[in-house]
Amino acid sequence: MDERLLSGESAYEDADLEYSLRPQTLRQYIGQDKAKHNLEVFIEAAKMREETLDHVLLYGPPGLGKTTLANIIANEMGVNIRTTSGPAIERPGDLAAVLTALQPGDVLFIDEIHRLHRSIEEVLYPAMEDFCLDIVIGKGPTARSVRLDLPPFTLVGATTRAGALSAPLRDRFGVLSRLEYYTVDQLSAIVERTAEVFEVEIDSLAALEIARRARGTPRIANRLLRRVRDFAQVRGDGTIAMEITQMALELLQVDKLGLDHIDHKFLLGIIEKFRGGPVGLETVSATIGEESHTIEDVYEPYLLQIGFLQRTPRGRIVTPLAYQHFGMEMPKI
């Protein structure tokens, strides 16, 4: 996949910044009001009963704050968090090592939990339900199963593809929270807060302009702010004003709706080669040279959100709004 400024996926350079900007409490966390309010109630109730919080599944597009919320849950509960990911747990023994290292009440955060192998999931079921671990010692006829007790813990799973989780795993989560795209006002507040951390002056209109082009995603808003700051320091006086912001975003090929050259390639490919659709996912994948799951998980969610694309039983269709955005007329049937 092309290097993409507007990807919601975490990049290497995002890690340190996101850690330094990460709010520590639900009160500090901007946006996701519904999920935040519910978690506040569930956490307070668990603390009042002196119990661990029910297992939590956070799902939604990348870059919306799932990792941040997992850390906040641990902070609010006053416990430690251990972090891993679905791809990192390759064998049942890997999971057993993580589970047996937990202390009572700890939060275990598994990112990309939909990528756990089914054999790993089966080890996880009794751990989630009964706080125990069944392991097999030996091989062949002499093999025997041993059950180990685990301390009570809270599993927080994060995924961009909730539908890819097996039903037995999904059903074992007591709390399911979908994270939604952020509003422009919420993103503008995040941009201004990040600018304070950077100790750089930003115009409120410039913050709004960055927010409008950030695809409803805080990670993208902060990434755009970093790049605009570069232009402000090199081509301006260091202040992030509206004029330098617009110039920087145009040079970065981020249009007024937050679409970049890859979005243009995707939409125009369907328009020019397939008369706007309908066209099958695999055909689009072959045409633009991207894997189908990348198209589904990375490209399409925002295009669906802004009404530029429709998924139908017959395939993908580019909408009149997209034609209008490109200044093109829809083909006559």
UniProtKB/Swiss-Prot annotation:
Family annotation (InterPro entries): AAA+_ATPase, AAA_lid_4, DNA_helicase_Holl-junc_RuvB, P-loop_NTPase, RuvB-like_N, RuvB_C, WH-like_DNA-bd_sf, WH_DNA-bd_sf
Region described as Head domain (RuvB-H): 256-333
Chain intervals for the UniProt region annotation (Large ATPase domain (RuvB-L)): 1-182
Residue numbers binding DNA: R311, R316
GO cellular component: cytoplasm; Holliday junction resolvase complex
Reaction it catalyzes: ATP + H2O = ADP + phosphate + H(+)
Record: residues binding ATP: L21, R22, G63, K66, T67, T68, E129, D130, F131, R172, Y182, R219
GO biological process annotation, one example: DNA repair
Record-annotated membrane-spanning stretches: none
UniProt-recorded Gene Ontology molecular function terms: ATP binding; ATP hydrolysis activity; four-way junction DNA binding; four-way junction helicase activity
Function: The RuvA-RuvB-RuvC complex processes Holliday junction (HJ) DNA during genetic recombination and DNA repair, while the RuvA-RuvB complex plays an important role in the rescue of blocked DNA replication forks via replication fork reversal (RFR). RuvA specifically binds to HJ cruciform DNA, conferring on it an open structure. The RuvB hexamer acts as an ATP-dependent pump, pulling dsDNA into and through the RuvAB complex. RuvB forms 2 homohexamers on either side of HJ DNA bound by 1 or 2 RuvA tetramers; 4 subunits per hexamer contact DNA at a time.
Domain description: Has 3 domains, the large (RuvB-L) and small ATPase (RuvB-S) domains and the C-terminal head (RuvB-H) domain. The head domain binds DNA, while the ATPase domains jointly bind ATP, ADP or are empty depending on the state of the subunit in the translocation cycle. During a single DNA translocation step the structure of each domain remains the same, but their relative positions change.
Record note on quaternary structure: Homohexamer. Forms an RuvA(8)-RuvB(12)-Holliday junction (HJ) complex. HJ DNA is sandwiched between 2 RuvA tetramers; dsDNA enters through RuvA and exits via RuvB. An RuvB hexamer assembles on each DNA strand where it exits the tetramer. Each RuvB hexamer is contacted by two RuvA subunits (via domain III) on 2 adjacent RuvB subunits; this complex drives branch migration. In the full resolvosome a probable DNA-RuvA(4)-RuvB(12)-RuvC(2) complex forms which resolves the HJ.
Family: Belongs to the RuvB family.
Name of the protein described by the UniProt record: Holliday junction branch migration complex subunit RuvB
